[in-house]
Amino acid sequence: MVLFYTLHTTKRRRNMKKQGFGTTKDGKEALLYTLSNKNGMEISVTDYGAHLVSVLVPDKDGKKRDVVLGFDSVTGYETDGSHFGATIGRNGNRIAGAAFELHGKTYQLAKNENNNNLHSGPDGYDYRLWKV
């Protein structure tokens, strides 16, 4: 997020491009936002799950290199369980048995990794279409 803030200020807004990133399983259009700066750096973020899709930085010879793992369309993020570049929430990591106790009350969560809840399950932040 610090990187995002550094690249995206009101003054630099003209350096933001928006383009289609595919259609979600439920028929909604996902968008890709690409921000760039004067140093040749670019980041791309999709509104689907607020995934960081790519970070292009110039190498020692000035050639741009992508330094993060990501997919070319929203389909990859919907079907692959790796959570590349994901905004994770409400909980991160695994909750064993997909249940936890708080103040004497047991809460059952959705199971999405064997018998566990991983990164908030199938309704985590990384599976939602965000408003930008």
Language model features with spans:
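Surface-exposed acidic/polar loop and edge beta-strand patches at domain peripheries
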Residues: N15-V132
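Short, Lys/Arg-enriched N-terminal segments with co-localized hydrophobic residues
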Residues: V2-N15
